[in-house]
Amino acid sequence: MESESARMSSAAEARFRINSPNSQPRAVKVIALDTPSERVVKELAQSPWQRATFLTASAFSGAPRQGERFSMGGWLNDLAGRTKNLVDEVESADLVVMVASAGENAAAAAIIGEACNVKRVMTTALILAPPPEGKVGVSDETLSKMLSALRPHAMMLVISSADEYIKDMLAALRA
């Protein structure tokens, strides 16, 4: 009996295959959640992209103090430092990629994830876990805490020990 893979790679099935890439690149918003990941996102932004926008949420300070009003637009910035409105950015996205460094504060992921959920925009969280200088890697406890913080707010979670992975992923998504 022929396997499904063998059958699908036959000449008879090849006529149904689509050999051209997606006709339109995805609008991807890449958001650094903390200061260390901001450096990586700024480096990524130097590459040529079709429809990728790079933002930072490292100015997010958590819930407003008692008596203060919460603003969706006061803490998200583009790489030039201009304030951006989270809802507007999410509405114009096909995918939001949140980049966080293991061991850092990723509190902004909750609000970004909620905005994406309301607008039905896919989310991915990338955890940067490069080994500290002279060490083998990030501790399991540190990774576990970060995974727990991001899991409720991302459809897909990826742990990366190299910054290049993000660039490769965005290229594969035709960002």
Where are these regions (language model features)?
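Glycine-rich, small/polar surface segments that engage phosphate groups of diverse ligands
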Residues: S20-L79
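Short beta-alpha junction loops
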Residues: V121-E141
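Short N-terminal or domain-adjacent regulatory/targeting segments
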Residues: M1-R26, A80
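Short, glycine-rich nucleotide/cofactor-binding loops
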Residues: L95-A106
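A short, aliphatic-rich alpha-helical micro-motif
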Residues: V87-E91, L150-R151
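Structural motif
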Residues: V30-T35, A100-A102, L128-A129, A162
